[in-house]
Amino acid sequence: MRRLRKPPGLFRRIASLTMLAWVLGFLWFALLLPQPADDRTTDGIVVVTGGGGRIPRALTELRAGHARKLLIAGVDREVKPGDFAAEYGVEPRLLQCCITLGYDSVDTRSNGLEAARWVAAQRLHSIRLITTDWHMRRAAFDLAAALPDD
């Protein structure tokens, strides 16, 4: 006597579809990561802290003349400008004229708000955002949401 198989239950179908959607979403995310910006000049650079290499990259872009102003958002309140300059080899003249240490943000959303205030205060029209590739979409989204629509 042959046993009839019971069709998969609703729970298994939903779980399978959920897993498939997650895998496809992850593949989309991983394969379409944003690429580094070209050498185009912008008015300013915004770098959000949190990972190695971001600040040195921003300083390289600033020194190369790809922007005239730099905001480093999310700096710990314990970090003093002199300590920052010593850590990253920043000349006092460059620190004074061109670099703003932003102490107001603690997460990606507040990075966007802090950066938007800085962009408005500096009257900048174009900016370059520096963060990690996997963080770029979220950081760009939060920054765009905080900037005015003009």
Model-derived features with residue positions:
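A structural signal for short, hydrophobic/glycine-enriched beta-strand patches
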Residues: 30-150
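N-terminal type II signal-anchor transmembrane helix
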Residues: 2-36
